[in-house]
Regions:
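Bacterial N-terminal signal peptides that target proteins for export
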Residues: 1-10
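Von Willebrand factor
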Residues: 48-175, 179-181
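Catalytic metal-binding/acid-base residues of hydrolase active sites
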Residues: 60, 186-187
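Bacterial N-terminal signal peptides
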Residues: 11-20
Length: 266
């Protein structure tokens, strides 16, 4: 169909305004990559005032109910841990059972960010607004990552790839104030120490036996005394496994870190 001169003029103006091809212009919506990183007061990896949050999500499936549960629990925890804190870095990895691959969430890559108000150097209202924009944007990015993840049910519930992946992230951004949020229901179909033949007959004793088996075989990555909060325990599409899920979380938590706690979240 032949386009009118007016339509061509409008298209050209739109492309010029974007300084990129028209197709690329559509992708330049809200971008969280620069929020909090332009300030001369941005925190560094050696800044003890900066908090480093590492989010690890072992997603059992990507139904909307599961995604909503994960997003609500994770962000309630992040907001609680960063309440009143304006200098921090957020790192997030998602594992869905695809080999050992962990997907890093856009704008949650460990970049140090500062939303600190400094009199005479920046605007307090803008700092607060950008901090909120950053959280809102990363929340959407995380939701999109979870919704588009491809799952391998044969290895679901194996959170260990996330723990191994997190070690490098913790080292890179270690400020002395690192907190790890691990979301998993621990209901694994693994073939090694995590193999659970009859989860329906699970018990605290069996959960402890499985966790110890992994530890004895040196198949359980540990995080020393890093602050670790476990979410997702008791969650599953099979409600009969809820109790065993919680028992597994408790058994593994105390072996992952000496400073680990299990929380149901909200």
């Amino acid at each position: 169909m032949k386009r009118s001169p007016l339509s061509l003029l409008v298209a050209a103006a739109f492309s010029f305004a974007c300084c990129t091809p028209i197709a690329a212009c559509e992708q330049q919506s809200a971008d969280c990559s620069e929020l909090g990183v332009n300030s001369s007061n941005a925190p560094t990896s050696t800044n003890a005032q900066s908090t480093n949050i590492v989010v690890l999500i072992d997603l059992p499936n990507n139904t909307q109910d599961t995604i909503d549960k994960v997003i609500n629990q994770v962000y309630n925890t992040i907001e609680h841990q960063l309440d009143g804190i304006t200098e921090f870095s957020l790192t997030a990895g998602v594992y869905t059972g695809q080999s050992n691959n962990v997907t890093t969430v856009t704008c949650m890559d460990g970049t140090a960010r500062s939303f600190t108000y400094v009199e005479g150097e920046n605007n307090e209202t803008r700092q607060k607004r950008e901090r909120k924009e950053y959280f809102d944007s990363t929340k959407k990015q995380l939701e999109n990552t979870l919704a588009t993840s491809t799952h391998n049910k044969s290895t679901s519930g194996d959170f260990r790839s996330l723990l191994s992946w997190s070690k490098d992230k913790i080292t890179q951004n270690n400020t002395g104030n690192t907190k790890v949020i691990l979301w998993s229901n621990f209901l694994s179909n693994g073939t090694d120490c995590l193999n659970i033949e009859s989860p329906s007959s699970g018990s605290s004793a069996l959960a402890d036996e499985i966790a110890q088996r992994c530890q004895d075989a040196d198949l359980l990555p540990t995080l020393g005394n890093i602050d670790v909060q476990v979410l997702g325990s008791g969650y599953g599409t099979d409600t009969s496994l809820a109790s065993f899920s919680s028992q597994l979380a408790t058994a593994f938590c105390k072996r992952i870190s000496t400073n680990c706690r299990v929380s149901q979240g909200k």
